[in-house]
Amino acid sequence: MKNLTDSFVYLGHWPSAGSFGFNTDILATNPINLSVVFGVLIFFGKGVLNDLLDNRKQRILNTIRNSEELRERAIQQLENARARLRKVETEADQFRVNGYSEIEREKLNLINSTYRTLKQLENYKNETILFEQQRTINQVRERVFQQALQGAIGTLNSCLSNELHLSTINANIGMFGTMKEITD
């Protein structure tokens, strides 16, 4: 390894007269040689450098273009999401309003139904009371009539003879049958 390093050191110290070698002393180098080397580097390196810079520029432009496309898609997706959100909020508001309306409607229906039921119960109660009053009145009439009839029969039995008694009974039975037909 040392021999290899020494050989490079010796290349830098070759004599300059009549031979070709590397001059590592920059201050001693001829400006014309430097300008030729720089010219060759610039001439050939310019194309390579331009290609590298153009490739880099194209990659940067493509990245920017892709970023812009992604940004536009993201903006579009955001707008779509906002539109869906507005639509969902509107539908939620409609459901809420419809729900409140439905609750109020059901409440009114329940109140009306309860009112009708109470009214029917009141009518049934009044009909039952009237029916019971009529039944009681008819029972009282029948008892009064029976008592009057028994009293009349008792009076007739004590005051009349058998023959008169039988004719009076037949007349009363006929009147009773007529009265019964009238009351029915």
UniProtKB/Swiss-Prot annotation:
One of its GO terms (molecular function) is proton-transporting ATP synthase activity, rotational mechanism. It is a single-pass membrane protein. Keywords: ATP synthesis, CF(0), Chloroplast, Hydrogen ion transport, Ion transport, Membrane, Plastid, Thylakoid, Transmembrane, Transmembrane helix, Transport. GO terms for cellular component: chloroplast thylakoid membrane; proton-transporting ATP synthase complex. The chain crosses the membrane at residues 27-49. It is found in: Plastid, Chloroplast thylakoid membrane. In plastids the F-type ATPase is also known as CF(1)CF(0). F-type ATPases have 2 components, F(1) - the catalytic core - and F(0) - the membrane proton channel. F(1) has five subunits: alpha(3), beta(3), gamma(1), delta(1), epsilon(1). F(0) has four main subunits: a(1), b(1), b'(1) and c(10-14). The alpha and beta chains form an alternating ring which encloses part of the gamma chain. F(1) is attached to F(0) by a central stalk formed by the gamma and epsilon chains, while a peripheral stalk is formed by the delta, b and b' chains. This is ATP synthase subunit b, chloroplastic.
